[in-house]
Amino acid sequence: MKKKVVSIMMTAALAVGMLAGCGNSDSGSSNAASGNDSKSTSEAGSTSASASNAAEEEEITTTLTVWSPSEDQASDSGEWLQTMCNQFAEEHPSWHITSDYGVCAESDAKDTVTQDVEGAADVYMFANDNLTSLIAANGISKLGGQTVEEVKENNSQAIVDSVSVDGDIYGVPFTTNTWFMYYDKSAFTEDEVKNLDTMIAKDKISFPITNSWYIASFYVANGCTLFGEDGTDEAAGVDFEGDKAKAVTDYLVDLVNNPNFVSDADGSGLSGLRDGSVKAMFSGSWDASAVKEALGDNYGVVQLPTITINGEEKQMKSFSGSKAIGVNPNCEYPQVAVALARYLGSADAQKAHYEMRNVVPCNEELLSQITDDALVTAQNDTFNNTSIIQPFVKNMSNYWTPAENFGKSLVNGEVTHDNAAEMTEKLNTSMNTSAVE
């Protein structure tokens, strides 16, 4: 993926012989560390966050390449990234900074950064399930000092864990990442939306059953696990087997054959909310504005409902994680890059992110001040009550395609009550088998 970079001058006075930032700039003047030096460079990034005021006063002229989703740089959402970087530069007058902005979605970080680590951005945003790939490619710095202290102080333990590997912290979180339920308040009461079966008995609901990020929620509800109870035990593998998993498959066979069930694909759920043919759908904060526009005063949003399996209520649980700011270890001035990452994940930056783009913050103090936003409540209730941290162990990559195909088989009628046990066992085997084996 080529970098789409727009250079923006952030300070008036820049030295003629300007040093490049941590990553390679378009001018090719980067002093990025070689592969042999990357370990020491990463360690420098770890300690830079606790640099003294004396180091802060050091005159530095540098270029930083910063990547974010295009929406963070768009004029119609207030140019959040440019605004924050400008404010950061103003607060550090001894650091003469030019920023080069590039477009990279958080979910694409592992593919884009690892393609050319030394040429990648100095500071970038990533989804936490990208973390193991970024670490393996030496594309992200281990953080330390004041940065780690602030991450631990400002976030829940679950958020801290989402950006940690083997006890080390690799990113500054700025939002949770999960999905929940939107519904039409004219169709369902607050009590009815607590149970999916109660809802579907009354009106149409849409669910992306063929999307592997969503389908696991039913199996986890009934005790199935992915890589152990906390998602970190790679040796445990995926446990979607036995009676507990077959019971879920039987439930899903009934669900997809219910005349009030709509398989959400290619935006059909949102379209259904707009035209009134669907009364509930499952998605994340990225659809909030569109759902609000579709439902108006009947806009409802809550954490996930329960489902009823063999007469017992079981809590659906979505995958959840975080989005965070990471630092490329190939830095000439890691203290500048780490300080910017810390700033972009600060309470002030999260507040601006929320006000400009509806990005729900994860800073606990800031969240305590937002008490009248149903979206914020739903996302954080989901994260805290009705989700599991999405595993980011290496073998999680074996899960996605089999789960997607199984959802398609359910919709196509290939999975039935008669073959539920057999098909579930095949699913479990596939999710525990590498595609290259």
Q: Each predicted region: which residue ranges?
A:
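Conserved N-terminal structural module of periplasmic/extracytoplasmic solute-binding proteins
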Residues: 7, 23-130, 429-437
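C-terminal motif of bacterial Sec signal peptides marking the signal peptidase cleavage site
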Residues: 18-21
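Hinge/lid segment of periplasmic solute-binding proteins
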Residues: 56, 126-180, 191-192, 302-303, ...
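A structural signal for short loop-to-beta-strand junctions that line the ligand-binding cleft
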Residues: 114, 119-122, 149-183, 204-208, ...
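Extracytoplasmic/periplasmic solute-binding protein
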Residues: 170-174, 179, 196-238, 244, ...
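Glycine-centered hinge/linker elements that transmit conformational signals in sensory
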Residues: 234-264
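Extracytoplasmic/periplasmic substrate-recognition and gating elements
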Residues: 293-356
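C-terminal capping/gating helix-and-loop segments adjacent to ligand/active sites or protein-protein/ligand interfaces
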Residues: 357-360, 376-432
